[in-house]
Structures are given as C-alpha cells and as structure tokens.
Amino acid sequence: MKTAPITPGRLAFSPDGVPLAPEFGDVYHPAAGALQQAHHVFLGGNRLPARWGGRGRFVILETGFGLGNNFLATWDAWQRDPQRCERLVFVSIEKHPLTREDLARAHAASPLPELARALVSAWPLSTPNLHPIAFEGGRVQLLLGFGDVALLLPQLVVSVDAFFLDGFAPARNPEMWEPRRLQRLGRLAAPGATAATWSAARVVRDGLSAAGFTVETTAGTGGKRDITVARFTPRHIAVPPPGGWHAHDAASREALVIGAGLAGCAAAWALSQQGWQCQLLDRAAEPADVTSGNPAGLFHGSFHRDDGPHARTLRAAALATERLAGAWIAQGRVSGQLAGCLRLESRWSDDAARAAMAAQQIAPGYIDWMDRAVASTLSGLALPSGAWFYPGGGWLAPRDYARELLARSGSLFRGGIDVATIERHSGLWRVLDEQRQVIAEAPVLVLANGLGANGLLASGRGEVPWPLTAVRGQISSLATDGHPATLPCPRLPVAGGGYVLPQTGGRLLFGATSQPDDIDPALRDADHRFNLQQLAGLSGCDVEAWSSLPWQGRVGWRAVTSDRLPLIGAVPDLEALDRTSRADQPRFVPRQRDARGGLYVFTGLGSRGITWAALGGQLLASWISGAPCPLEADLRDALDPARYALPRWRSDS
C-alpha cells in the first residue's frame, strides 16, 4: 500500500458553539448534541449495548472518527453495562485527524470529562498508520487508522460485529460514501453484523444492500427525519483465504511460549491483553538473561523517501514502544530515557532531507532533520554530520522492559528448562526434554527462542521454510568515574555506524560489532578496538586517549532474516502449499491446521528487539486470538513467516 500524506483537520465553532469542519463546510455533530446522536443512531441502530452482552470480544468499525464522540459514548455505555462484553474493540478511520490541542478544545466542556481527558492524553501523532491504544487495562481497545478510507478499508484484518457509518454528508464528502467503499464492508462483516448511519441517502442504502446487508430506515433524531439501519444477510458466506486470517480455534485460551527474552515476554503480555494465559519456558534461570540481557539499548523509528514496508513497520513499532515503554520509564518501572534519539546521516544534505520530509508531510513529533551544528548542540558531541532526530526515541534496559512485560502478563515463568523437541498429541502441543519426558502442553505453542526456533521447528515437523542467521554482537563499556572530561558522554543516544548511549550506572555503553556466523563467546580486544573506532566516528574524538582504559563488554547473538524483518505469525504448512492453487501472497499460504494447528513463531528481531517487541507481541496475539490486527494487511504479509515459502509455490506452479 502506498501511503498518502496526512493533513490534520481544522476545528472551528459556530456562534452557538457547534464544532465545524471548515474544509467540508459541515458540522461535526448536530446542534442537539453529539452524545444524543451517538446513542440514538449508532448505539441504538446497532442494538447496543444488548448485543455485546456476555460476549468475549465485540468489535465496532467506524468510518470517520471526527471528535471521537461516538467512541466516548460507546466506552461510557460499556462502563455502565453490568452485562458488558469482556473486551470492547473500537476500530476507527480518520482521514483528517485533529491535533491534540484541537481535540482538547473540542472536549473542553465534554459531558464525559474523565473519558475525554483519557482520550486526549492518549492521542497519537498524525502518522499514516494504525495506532493501537489500550484503556481499562486492555479491556477497551481503540485502533485508530489515520488515512483515506479508500486506502485503509482494504487493508484492515478484522471481523466486525457493528458498523458506525459516520462522516460528513454525502453531498459534501462523496468519496466516503461511494458504493465501492460501502461494498467492502461485506468482506469485514462477522456473521450477524449490523450497521447504522445517520444518512438515509439513496446512495448509502444501495451501497449497503450491494454489500450484503438488509437495509431499512427508521426514525431519526436531531433534525433528521430518517436514519439507516442494516443487518448483514449475505446470499453467500465468503470462504476465508486458505492462509487463514482467523484465530486458532482453541477450546481453552492457553499458550506455551518457549523463550523468555523480549519476544517471549512481549508475546505473553499481548496475549494476556486478549484474555489468554501463558506459560513461559526458558533455558536460563531468569527471564531476559541471554541476548535480551544487555544493560541498555536504543530504540527509534525509520524514514525512507518511498515510505515502503520497512519504514512503515518500523514507524508503527517505534510508536508502540514509545507508548508502552515510555509510560513505564516515566513511572520508574523501567530504567531508561525518553528524550529522543539522533541517527547520523552523511548521505543526505540539509536541503534534501527537509525536502523529503516536506514531500511526505510527516508529523514533526515523529521525525525532524537537524543540521550538524544543531545536532551537535543537542547531543553534546561534535558530530561529523547532520542527523535525523526521533523525538519519541530513546534508550532503556531491555531486561527491565522484558520483566515488566512478563509481570504485567501474569504468566507463569519456568526457568532452567531445556526443551529438546516439540510434538503434537491429541490436540495439544507438547514440549519434551532429552529423555522425551513431557515438560508442559497447551493447544497453542509459540516459538520465541531466537535462533533456537529453527531447531525446535525441525524437531516437530521436519522442514524449516525460512533462513535465520546468527549474527554475533559485542558491546563495550567504560567507567566514567575519573574520566568525565575526556569520554564523549552524549545527552541522548546517537547512532549511525555504531551507537553510543548516555552514561548510566557510572558507565558509557557503546558498540556494536556485527559478525554473521561467528560463534565465539569470548570477549575480544580486537572487537573492543573496533567499537572504539566507531565511537570515535560518532563523536569526533581521538580514541587513543581511551584505548588503555579498563573496559567491560558482553557478547550476544542476534537472529537475523535475509530481509531484516521479523518472523511473526502462524507456521506455514508446506505439504498443503504444494497442493494449493493460489499462494501469490503470504496471506494465501496454508497454515498448520487440525491435528497440527496452533504453531506460531516470533523471532528474527535482529538488532531491533526493543523496537519490535510491543508491536510484534500485539501482531502475534491478533494471529492467535482473532483480535483486530494492529498492522495493515500488506505489512502483516511483510512480517508473515510464510513469505519465505512463496518461491517454493512459484517454482511448482
């Protein structure tokens, strides 16, 4: 999907205080009030809250978030309902999101002040992607999609129980209500889905009918004579693609996760947000004790001229990390700093960088360009070039982060467990030791043990469909005590041909080497000298002054894929792939089902484990639980482990 620049909405008010959208020449809601319309049209028209009573999860899709009044009214109704669903998921698309300041102005006199303040506080940057936001400890989940409905509707991976068709009038915003847009709703509708809109225009009713809905009009409100309500009654039930976009059909919501590093702990946390219970097994005695045990690491997004899959997925991942870990850093639960990150870039001139940003109209709160002088002042180092500045980036202690994820998940951790093989038995996945004694079993198994995932996968099913390379990395640190005047201690992380972090715990941490297929666990002087040279390149300082200082280091191995993107999702069924007639995209590749279903992988995070963890866990949880996917469909494909099976199908087809 090619993203389009986001133009923020403008907010004005009529003389009697009704909020207006000047670009559309229309009101955000009628003078009678937004909540009255929300209750009569959208909640009442979808027979809510009655329909969500007793449900494990209820999903609403809204076309046009606007001021967020429909979401607030729905959240309030959920809070007040003693029979409420276990989890409420509200997905909403908005082409012109307001700034946080305008959203706060719009809700200055909200009749739901606490909920409105929570929404304003959580309001994301106006970047062109999906933004998952959790309230009520994860029991109310808002998934905001900023962009054109024409681009985002085909990219949603979601099963919708109720549609709130909002937006400005068809006469003023015809693209929103085009029949082909409305017809796409049928692809997303769950059995028994309903829809409601304040518009009774013929084009709206015909579009819903063509999408498989039975349409009728009923009494309106707020000056509207009629409104439209509809029930999904398709003539034919669509068969999901063979790759399966749906949840694993498990009788109990229990999962085994092998590996208790960042990936495994994030998987457990995200699954707990969907009501799943996990048991984590790890060879180490404590969680996050191997590669995720580095004392500190940095995180930030990415920027490319074409805004392709790498840039888009890393942007979404960095924003998710900032939202989750940033709060824990502020609370003192995770050691770290959320004060931005600089990434040096000598290939860009100042003019070219600013022109690329202007072309994408990227939100300044996500990225900015700083020339050499400004970047040097910000960092406190004499930098050799200009740099991209990521305001939401920073550094944290990955062990703290992983253990906080694990603690919040409520999962059982079992350390000192050496899993030798895996097998499927009587509808459950079993993990076994060297003596083939059963260690644990569950209907769902997640391989989140880095490089060890391939060996276990081979033990349980034979062929491994993807390459995974072990890349050795050695980091270095120097004591800052007694050397503050000579060591280049930045005020914030600086990266680009290596990295250096602000001093913490009396030490300066920098690195790192990148050595594929090097299995030497010993610290090496040559690698420390290499890290010093990288530090010199970042800081403009002479390394000779530090080469004789005592140093410490740590060695770990990153699991890296050939395309530098993680492997997150259901393991493909290669035998079924050989028999399928269509597998031109990862989503169509068959998965393990029935006797061999319930096998998932979360590995290949490379050197960006901190950045990938939160979003990767949420993506994995959506695969397993059937919750709305936090990424667009093409980005889900880009991280799908089945992408490596496509050449096999093409060669056989």
Swiss-Prot record:
It comes from Methylibium petroleiphilum (strain ATCC BAA-1232 / LMG 22953 / PM1). It is found in: Cytoplasm. InterPro entries: FAD-dep_OxRdtase, FAD/NAD-bd_sf, MnmC-like_methylTransf, SAM-dependent_MTases_sf, tRNA_MAMT_biosynth_bifunc_MnmC, tRNA_MNMC2, tRNA_S-uridine_synth_MnmC_C. It holds the Pfam family DAO. Its cofactor is FAD. Disulfide bonds: none annotated. The gene is mnmC. The keyword Secreted does not apply. SUPFAM superfamilies: FAD/NAD(P)-binding domain. Residues 258-653 are annotated as: FAD-dependent cmnm(5)s(2)U34 oxidoreductase. It comes from the Bacteria. Its EC number is 2.1.1.61, 1.5.-.-. Catalyzes the last two steps in the biosynthesis of 5-methylaminomethyl-2-thiouridine (mnm(5)s(2)U) at the wobble position (U34) in tRNA. Catalyzes the FAD-dependent demodification of cmnm(5)s(2)U34 to nm(5)s(2)U34, followed by the transfer of a methyl group from S-adenosyl-L-methionine to nm(5)s(2)U34, to form mnm(5)s(2)U34. In the N-terminal section; belongs to the methyltransferase superfamily. tRNA (mnm(5)s(2)U34)-methyltransferase family. In the C-terminal section; belongs to the DAO family. GO terms for cellular component: cytoplasm. Residues 1-233 are annotated as: tRNA (mnm(5)s(2)U34)-methyltransferase. GO terms for molecular function: flavin adenine dinucleotide binding; oxidoreductase activity, acting on the CH-NH group of donors; tRNA (5-methylaminomethyl-2-thiouridylate)(34)-methyltransferase activity. This is tRNA 5-methylaminomethyl-2-thiouridine biosynthesis bifunctional protein MnmC. Keywords: Cytoplasm, FAD, Flavoprotein, Methyltransferase, Multifunctional enzyme, Oxidoreductase, S-adenosyl-L-methionine, Transferase, tRNA processing. GO terms for biological process: methylation; tRNA wobble base modification. Gene3D superfamilies: D-Amino Acid Oxidase, subunit A, domain 2, FAD/NAD(P)-binding domain, Vaccinia Virus protein VP39. It catalyses: 5-aminomethyl-2-thiouridine(34) in tRNA + S-adenosyl-L-methionine = 5-methylaminomethyl-2-thiouridine(34) in tRNA + S-adenosyl-L-homocysteine + H(+).
